[in-house]
Amino acid sequence: MKKILVAEDTESNFLLLSIILRKDYEILRAFNGAEAVEICRVEHPDLILMDIKMPVMDGLEATKVIRTFNEEIVIIALTANAYDSDREKAYLAGCNNYMAKPVMAAKLREMIHSYLG
């Protein structure tokens, strides 16, 4: 089973994402960007759903760090900010794609499937 790391500090958002994905994927959790970096080093997930605004280290900084040791992993930025400038910042940090919250379950599954098959 493919592994997805959900880097999300808000419990309700994590639970929603987990419910959407747990049938088809093994779900890992990070509460902040620093944890996401460490889990990525150890667990080697196939894809990361990266919240942008998190404590300790934000999602953009975590993405930049992850890209220093893993250029292949798929990283999808998740944020409540749906501005074009936020999307551009996510891509510049190294994210493969971007989705505004609240996420639509079918759209998220489709996006993940396009990367993981």
Where is each model-derived feature located?
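Two-component/phosphorelay signaling modules centered on CheY-like receiver
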Residues: 10-28
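Active-site beta3 strand of CheY-like receiver
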Residues: 43-49
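C-terminal output helix
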Residues: 103-112
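Receiver (REC) domain active-site loop signature in two-component systems and cognate sites
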Residues: 54
